[in-house]
Amino acid sequence: MSLAHTAAEYMLSDALLPDRRGPRLKGLRLELPLDRIVKFVAVGSPLLLMSLAFAQEFSSGSPISCFSPSNFSIRQAAYVDSSCWDSLLHHKQDGPGQDKMKSLWPHKALPYSLLALALLMYLPVLLWQYAAVPALSSDLLFIISELDKSYNRSIRLVQHMLKIRQKSSDPYVFWNELEKARKERYFEFPLLERYLACKQRSHSLVATYLLRNSLLLIFTSATYLYLGHFHLDVFFQEEFSCSIKTGLLSDETHVPNLITCRLTSLSIFQIVSLSSVAIYTILVPVIIYNLTRLCRWDKRLLSVYEMLPAFDLLSRKMLGCPINDLNVILLFLRANISELISFSWLSVLCVLKDTTTQKHNIDTVVDFMTLLAGLEPSKPKHLTNSACDEHP
């Protein structure tokens, strides 16, 4: 065996990817990076603001401070604070004998409304986890495995071709067999391509993804409506008039009709309201961007894997409308690019292919590795001319 053939075999052996068996791909990302950010912000920010509201309530004691009459004892003043906080009604005299009441319940419901908002924003995440993640996980495991295996099969094919070339004494026989194999598509492995083509006709994943982001937009709009309708109405009201002349106290003459109270937690209420509006206003463009990514193909990822035999979705113009499961899978393949060991090898081969296309007819990794192994990717011209001379 010559030194060149030995070097070619070593080079091809090094190009083979390690066989990953057993518990593998444990770090598979089943959420896109931007979706994960949206989830943490949309769910985490209400919980953070809720903890801020509770912390203020625990640190300052009573959330309101009522100006009770001077003849009230400490226990009576505490009763006034408790009664006014329980009712949280603002009494306003519109005219003689006309008493108009306005509820200030958003102040009391602030922590619980934030908890409800966090749970509401977590519903799309649960939908994705239970409706899409199981199928997506199996799809990614199969496709990643097949992409790496297809690359390895291509390298092993070149190794086999090199051995045949070494054993063949007649170069005509080798090149005739090689051309026959190419014409009959022996070098192609259509299982993966057909599976991806089937995913173009499937829409379960993309429907779940669209529903997830649409629900986020709907819940965000509902949050705006809630804040605008309920919080804005009491946003600047720091003081209110409270009436405790109810029940047994309704006939007590020494009890004033209205007692002025001040909301000590108004600043926290305002901070929470403004923060919620700002946070979800920032999230809306991110959610819309996530949806727009479904309107275009990740052609760079596809172009790299065009180096594999039978993976010609781009060259054969098999890509149609991008709103299907295949596009969602491609987005997650891009997010899990670290699991695709073959991607780095094929990216290098794509760069090298661009520098040699003027000299050689290189279409796949088989052609390029054949060239690197010291074999011509196509029949040499002197053999072609000799064959033409023999068969004029």
Swiss-Prot record:
Q: Which residues lie on this side of the membrane: Extracellular?
A: 61-113, 237-267
Q: Which UniProt keywords apply?
A: Cell junction, Cell membrane, Endoplasmic reticulum, Gap junction, Glycoprotein, Ion channel, Ion transport, Membrane, Transmembrane, Transmembrane helix, Transport
Q: Cellular component terms, GO, for this chain's entry?
A: endoplasmic reticulum membrane; gap junction; plasma membrane
Annotated GO molecular function terms are: calcium channel activity; gap junction hemi-channel activity; structural molecule activity; wide pore channel activity
Provide the membrane-side ranges marked Cytoplasmic in the record.
1-39, 135-215, 289-392
Q: What is its main location?
A: membrane
Ranges that cross the membrane: 40-60, 114-134, 216-236, 268-288
Q: Name one GO biological process term.
A: osteoblast differentiation
Catalyzes what?
Ca(2+)(in) = Ca(2+)(out); ATP(in) = ATP(out)
Q: Which residues are glycosylated?
A: 71
The entry's family comment says:
Belongs to the pannexin family.
Assembly and partners?
Homoheptameric.
Q: What does this protein do?
A: Regulator of osteoblast differentiation by functionning as a Ca(2+) channel in the endoplasmic reticulum which regulates calmodulin (CaM) pathways. Allows ATP release into the extracellular space and activation or purinergic receptors.
Protein name, per record: Pannexin-3
Query: What is the species of this protein?
Result: Homo sapiens
By which gene is this protein encoded? PANX3
